[in-house]
């Protein structure tokens, strides 16, 4: 069976660049009809014709060249073999022919295996899956890593191929292996936003608590890259998918994971989680999932829960242990407030300078807390509306409140400027007042200067008398 023309570029798999832009292959979109050898060819001509046949996907010409004695594991420029090239463009029929002719499925060049090349190929998942399956059937090792310690499952997860991930695990791929940066397959999937791969890996027992070298978990990596659906899902304390398929046999796993029904099921599971409201997300984050049904039965919203008193907690059947978790979370969410009732009455004329300065410092600190709170909110909000997980009310409500905030901030700025001008005026008048009595600090400074000058003068006279006395004694 002849394969259609190849429409793709020959690139080094796994994101590893070639040592040169010209690796001896014809790069581009080629569509050539099948060719036949017109006569005997020199070895150099055979190699060149072989490369062209591989580039165009001309199966019949490839077979004819192999029949003429050309090695199936011929090493082209920079060490690529025909099978590695065929895998890099996901040409299933070409991969099959080369393997049937004895091509080495375990070949590697500079820690770049053919399986890694296939998993990182540019093509449809269906084509990549078939190529990977052929290579695994010829005992290609799914746990051999490249120079960056990335294994085939990491490349498949990074590029968003859940079925390829499942197939690799079914053939013994380690789910929780980490690369040179501490990334696992789950971390790569979370980083790239591939939710179906995330779910598949969790089913296969991926550890969502493994950290990268800079101390980040997959959920934190997802959050940093604005994949909030994945972040919320991975943040759940309990996960009904975790390790779901670990106890199945190899054959059962392949059958289970390569069916279209499983994809529909996982989409349903994920959508049920991402449809959670703010109450469910809050409870899952605290490990209080068991309270969800209880609160829903009593029509208790998150706003109501966060404003409950001690007696209301008990009345609604919330245990002391759960109460402590909620109260601890509330304490972390609180913004430090100034208790203005404890501050001095600024209007009183007898207020001390220290008290007034303390008031201004606390006011400034409060403004700093408010600025930090707003900055944190801005950094957490998704850039695109389709990434918002929780159900929000009309955006107009938020815009209206923000407009009021801006107005209040402008009013505050105006009042602070008035206060500053008033203080400056008082300071200028005070300095120009002839009846102004210097502060003790100023008086003590002046006295110390006089004392120092007096001491120097006395010492000077003493030294002069000593010189005179010494002179008289010598005479």
Curated annotation (Swiss-Prot):
Record carries keyword Cell cycle? no
Location of the region described as Disordered in the Swiss-Prot/TrEMBL record: 1-24
Q: Does the keyword Phosphoprotein apply?
A: yes
- Where is the secretion signal located? none
Q: Which InterPro entries match?
A: Ankyrin_rpt (IPR002110), Ankyrin_rpt-contain_sf (IPR036770), Asz1_SAM (IPR042650), SAM (IPR001660), SAM/pointed_sf (IPR013761)
Function statement: Plays a central role during spermatogenesis by repressing transposable elements and preventing their mobilization, which is essential for the germline integrity. Acts via the piRNA metabolic process, which mediates the repression of transposable elements during meiosis by forming complexes composed of piRNAs and Piwi proteins and governs the methylation and subsequent repression of transposons. Its association with pi-bodies suggests a participation in the primary piRNAs metabolic process.
The name of this protein is Ankyrin repeat, SAM and basic leucine zipper domain-containing protein 1
Q: What is the lineage of its organism?
A: Eukaryota, Metazoa, Chordata, Craniata, Vertebrata
